[in-house]
Amino acid sequence: MAAFHPKVSFGAAVSFLRPIALFSGLCLSGFVLAKSQIVSFSTDTTHYFPSESFEVAVVYETSDRGLATGIGIRVHFNSAQISVDSIVKPLRSGQVGIQIKQDAADYDNDPSTDYYVNAGWADINGAWPGSEGQPTELLHLLATTAADFSGTQLNITIASTDVNYAASGASLLLTSTAGD
């Protein structure tokens, strides 16, 4: 009995396998990028009077509560609307540095912000933030609204991240209660 040899062209095989490979790649990429480093804000209120002092915390967590090699962040602000008076309660574990810089590169793609707090933490053993637990506070900003405060937005952008994680920042809208 003769063997059956179907005639399938190479092009037909590729056309058949391409959607399967694409679907598999999309499914698997979801597993690879499923872990995230998340940086957000925590504050009691977002409504402020002109010339009012306030405090806002910058908070870190991972989606899987896992440890990482660290993170670098930027907290962008509009210096015509608020002044950052001091940066307090920094997470000491793995702290690399904290400084205020002019936002000439417009990292947050927001033309209204002109400065940012640049901060970073690192652990070469991939054990950051250590025994702090999650979520954990990275730092607190002590700030004051301008005398003519009309509202502004704070933005967090990610400068560097653990290679095993995707990362996301956040925005916080601060509104003026002048005239209320």
Pin down the residues of each PLM region.
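Acidic, low-complexity intrinsically disordered segments
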Residues: 33-180
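N-terminal signal peptide c-region/cleavage motif recognized by signal peptidases
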Residues: 29-31
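N-terminal secretory signal peptides that target proteins for export/translocation
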Residues: 1-16
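Sec-dependent signal peptide recognition
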Residues: 17-23
